[in-house]
């Protein structure tokens, strides 16, 4: 078992019954010229987040944790995005940006596009699971819940973008399904002002889960590995 120092208190978990979830580390969300950038959100400080996710993934994989990668987006016809009868049609900033800038139509979050692809620095490995998702929450219209339950996984460690949107949405839905959710704060990034990051982390540690950081996470896993060897 591994005990992770976190806010508001430490949490103990079995790495082999825990998944590291990497949320939407796509060009759309982390690269200049991607959807968030074109929609007016600041992505200039995402490089350290990418590096921290690399570190967390390496440590988690070495500890025997399942790695799950999410990619947010839709089919080329945007049927999966929902039409005017869906609130997603009205609230998705990607869809609104394409309606406001017709030259971008078909380029944002389209499966198979550069925008949809994971950033070059973060590549899934054999044994990892890559899941497409059509909405903010990774539990909506995906097999995530059945994958986790079939493997006896009850603890989820979250990284990725955006903390206040897809990360928090997935963690909240997991909370309602009886999963224990931990966010590594320096391996996440918000969409919007810095206060959005702080507010999301406050919500998580106060109401829905736990908050830690990459160095603490890696140290905890390393200590567990040494204990097994001894």
From Swiss-Prot:
Which Gene3D superfamilies does this chain map to? Isochorismatase-like
Induction is noted as: Up-regulated by the nitrogen regulatory protein C (NtrC also called GlnG) and repressed by RutR.
Is Hydrolase included in the keywords of this UniProt record? yes
Q: For this protein, what is any one GO molecular function term?
A: hydrolase activity, acting on carbon-nitrogen (but not peptide) bonds, in linear amides
InterPro entries in UniProt = Isochorismatase-like_dom (IPR000868), Isochorismatase-like_hydrls (IPR050272), Isochorismatase-like_sf (IPR036380), RutB (IPR019916)
Q: Which UniProt keywords apply?
A: Hydrolase
Q: Which Pfam families match?
A: Isochorismatase (PF00857)
Q: Which reaction does it catalyse?
A: (Z)-3-ureidoacrylate + H2O + H(+) = (Z)-3-aminoacrylate + NH4(+) + CO2; (Z)-3-ureidoacrylate + H2O = (Z)-3-aminoacrylate + carbamate + H(+); (Z)-2-methylureidoacrylate + H2O + H(+) = (Z)-2-methylaminoacrylate + NH4(+) + CO2
Question: What is the top-level taxon of the source organism?
Answer: Bacteria
Tell me the enzyme class: hydrolase
Q: Has keyword Ribonucleoprotein?
A: no
Q: What is its EC number?
A: 3.5.1.110
- Active site annotated at which positions? 24 (proton acceptor), 133, 166 (nucleophile)
Q: Name one GO biological process term.
A: nitrogen utilization
Q: Which PANTHER family match?
A: ISOCHORISMATASE-LIKE DOMAIN-CONTAINING PROTEIN, PEROXYUREIDOACRYLATE/UREIDOACRYLATE AMIDOHYDROLASE-RELATED
- Hey, which family's this protein in? Belongs to the isochorismatase family. RutB subfamily.
Role summary = Hydrolyzes ureidoacrylate to form aminoacrylate and carbamate. The carbamate hydrolyzes spontaneously, thereby releasing one of the nitrogen atoms of the pyrimidine ring as ammonia and one of its carbon atoms as CO2.
What protein name is recorded for this chain?
Answer: Ureidoacrylate amidohydrolase RutB
Organism expressing this protein natively: Escherichia coli O127:H6 (strain E2348/69 / EPEC)
